[in-house]
Amino acid sequence: MAAESTVELESSMKEHRDDDEKSNGFSVSAVSMDVEGGDKDPSGNGVSSVIPGWFSEISPMWPGEAHSLKIEKILFQGKSEYQKVMVFQSSTYGKVLVLDGVIQLTERDECAYQEMITHLPLCSIPNPKKVLVIGGGDGGVLREVARHSSIEKIDICEIDNMVVEVSKQFFPEVAVGFNDPRVTLRIGDGVAFLKAAPEGTYDAVIVDSSDPIGPAQELFEKPFFQSVARALRPGGVMCTQAESIWLHMDIIEDIVSNCRHIFKGSVNYAWTTVPTYPSGMIGFMLCSTEGPLVDFKHPVNPIDQKDCQKSVRPLKFYNSEIHTAAFCLPSFAKRKIGSKET
């Protein structure tokens, strides 16, 4: 007999449901799905109709490939003003957050992404105080930024409120970052927010975006990087998600080229392993503005050695050795982008 899974939102989300629908343009409803029976998914959220009970991630950004996880239970499906949102319980990676058919995080390996995109930039400068996060609606980057005791202010601008609410509901250990009193959440367009930010406001800007399609496309374009550079203090740093060297070398080359023209300090590409991302890895572009020299490859603010780690969730992935190793590129990538770094 086919097993059914029914989505029921907790009362905390139900209380805000009507207001959220009016102000953010999304609707949330209970969903039933015949997981074991392998029903086709007309909404395009990526549930495979070829292998019953499996989620398959298929995208034109990685043609000829499919990445699959076995589904135990569909926990949530909804559609916001911007994208389709799904959460399911997998057999081997815990709960999984999916946006427009693309895996954003799993409970098992989210640490490899969240810790690296945060600590690569913040451990490269002394005493960061003001940080802006663009995207990052799951709260994981906030959780990691909050480890740094020097931080006084954390702004986050996320375009999709459904991502925030769903993350708080289903991924509380990730979304715990929203509970930090230094955090100010703004629901809105990150591009517009940056344009309005006073010049030289931030020590670091972390861009936790999805792939350069849909609502995140602007976050990979030259005008956006110009806004980031303007919002940073002299010697300030940016770290942005920068795709996979196995799949998107053309995109990476464009990002490196744009950043070299805009940021007058250091420009480096780093990477980390994330098993549930296409090709099993993801890259980061790290840039600094003109001012005090930033050597991204050698951390000056080693968070893994500080006493504050005794009182919070231990680091699972990041350490100072991995920090330095993250900038080592395989030969084919070094030939393509290594010479373009500064």
UniProtKB/Swiss-Prot annotation:
HAMAP family the record matches: Spermidine_synth
Enzyme Commission number, as recorded: 2.5.1.16
Keywords: Polyamine biosynthesis, Spermidine biosynthesis, Transferase
Region described as Disordered: spans on this chain: 1-46
Active site: D208
Pathway, per record: Amine and polyamine biosynthesis; spermidine biosynthesis; spermidine from putrescine: step 1/1
Identification of the protein by name: Spermidine synthase 2
One example of a Gene Ontology biological process annotation: spermidine biosynthetic process
Source species: Pisum sativum (Garden pea)
Record-listed putrescine binding positions: Y113, D208, S209, S210, D211, Y277
